[in-house]
Amino acid sequence: MQYEIGVETMKVLLINGSPHEQGCTNRALEEVASSLKANGVDSEIFWIGKGSIRGCVACGSCGGVSNKCLFDDKVNEALEKMKEADALIVGSPVYYASLNGSLSAFLDRMFYAGACFHHKPAAAVASARRAGTTATLDIIQKYFTISQMPIVSSQYWNMVHGSSAEDVEKDLEGLQTMRTLGKNMAWMLKCIEAGKKAGIDIPDTEDKIKTNFIR
């Protein structure tokens, strides 16, 4: 069963920021996707790949409103998908208590070029052998909070543990946390849609005021 938004189905874009397409991060996202499906919400896992992803060069070509980066690669592919998505989940492996470098460059460019994130629910997921997960989640969530995206939580911090996808199968609490995240994301999307149908509009955004610390 799928929950309908008018004539369209709600959809969540899940970004796999690991260089391993079928690794721990993907296994976590698969569990979220399964839970979303069980709760009537469609999803797609988008893998950023293991090729080189260049960082933002602050050229300003995107203008922050065009939804397109000058460098036409997977970042623009994800932006096109995000235009149609109703929510976003970003997953990353832990590298030195942070997200991996490729994903960092990917998110910098995607969020700077994109104007399609406001008021769409979001969540971060981290995978690690041991520690560094909460620091990684904090960094990813900063992209969401500066973009006016409501953050969806779970029963615990959104993390799984293991050195391989097979290891993650043993992290029963981690997988349950992913399923709860999927349920909560589906619930949030349905609440937002119910609000729209009841006449509750998305908040207006003021023209941005910039104040420098040093003049």
Feature-to-residue mapping (PLM):
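Cofactor-binding loop segments of dinucleotide-utilizing enzymes, especially the Rossmann-like FAD-
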Residues: 15-17, 48, 126-129
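Helix-loop-strand module that forms the ligand-binding subsite of alpha/beta enzymes
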Residues: 64-156
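Short, Lys/Arg-enriched N-terminal segments with co-localized hydrophobic residues
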Residues: 1-9
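A short beta-strand-loop structural module common to alpha/beta enzyme folds
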Residues: 41-51
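Cysteine-cluster motifs in flexible loop/terminal segments that predominantly coordinate metals
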Residues: 51-82, 206-215
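Glycine-rich phosphate/pyrophosphate-binding loop and the adjoining helix
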Residues: 150-215
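N-terminal beta1-alpha1 ligand-phosphate binding loop
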Residues: 11-39
